[in-house]
Amino acid sequence: MQVFENITKMQEWAREQKKQGQSIALVPTMGYLHEGHLALVKEARRQCDKVVVSIFVNPIQFGAGEDFEQYPRDLEQDSALLEKERVDALFSPGIRDMYPGSFQTFVEVYGEITEKMCGASRPGHFKGVTTVVSKLFNICQPDRAYFGQKDAQQLMIVEKMVRELNFPLEIIRVPIVREKDGLAMSSRNVYLSPEERAEALVLYRALKMAEEEIKNGEREIGIIRQKMEEMIKACPRAAIDYIAINNANDLSELQTCAGKVLIALAVKFGKTRLIDNLIVEV
């Protein structure tokens, strides 16, 4: 596995692969890799000739008071995992390389899709995401880029950006990977105390309960949301950020559950904010 910290060298490598007719997959990550990330890597390995994984904890997608400084990092362990998965190139640039002192260019998707859910509680977050992802696409020149369904809103925003700015690549969605007890895998799970970890299982339980309600004929969004709230509020350490039930294609509001429905939530346990979601076909 080749390791690149320099942007120009990464671009030269990517150009060389293209010249040789090789297809390139990109898996963008912030590191501290777990099985969820490795599922993206495995899918990329199956579909493309060359696999690039980027590791960059992106400061501009963290707001004031968020966990940028504390975000877990272990490049040595990450590199070993990626070697095992036969990744061709690891791109891990420094902050000053990605954002020199004079940096003033941002890529932002406007509208309802970025204003609700995580966009409402983390202003500027998605602007940071779309800016860094645009840069990674230009640097690594992938034919396909792999994103996890756990960050459903982010995934849809990136898809919209790619479509509207005509990036010559395909976004591949990869299903959520869960622990045996149902908790969605996340690098932030390491922050949880044993008590918080036990309570965090309520996220998936609430989602499955909502799915069951819909399958049993409930169509009223307010009723489903209220039942989810009651279940989560029964956990003393849980503080709900949002529970959203929206159109799974574009995050638009639904009057009642119909078509493809995304049920998504964000809940804090202590200082740790966790997200999860599932899609129900009605």
Curated annotation (Swiss-Prot):
GO terms for biological process: pantothenate biosynthetic process. ATP binds at residues 30-37, 148-151, 177, 185-188. Gene3D superfamilies: HUPs, Pantoate-beta-alanine ligase, C-terminal domain. Homodimer. GO terms for cellular component: cytosol. It catalyses: (R)-pantoate + beta-alanine + ATP = (R)-pantothenate + AMP + diphosphate + H(+). Catalyzes the condensation of pantoate with beta-alanine in an ATP-dependent reaction via a pantoyl-adenylate intermediate. This is Pantothenate synthetase. The reaction proceeds by a bi uni uni bi ping pong mechanism. Its main location: cytoplasm. GO terms for molecular function: ATP binding; pantoate-beta-alanine ligase activity. The active site is at residue 37.
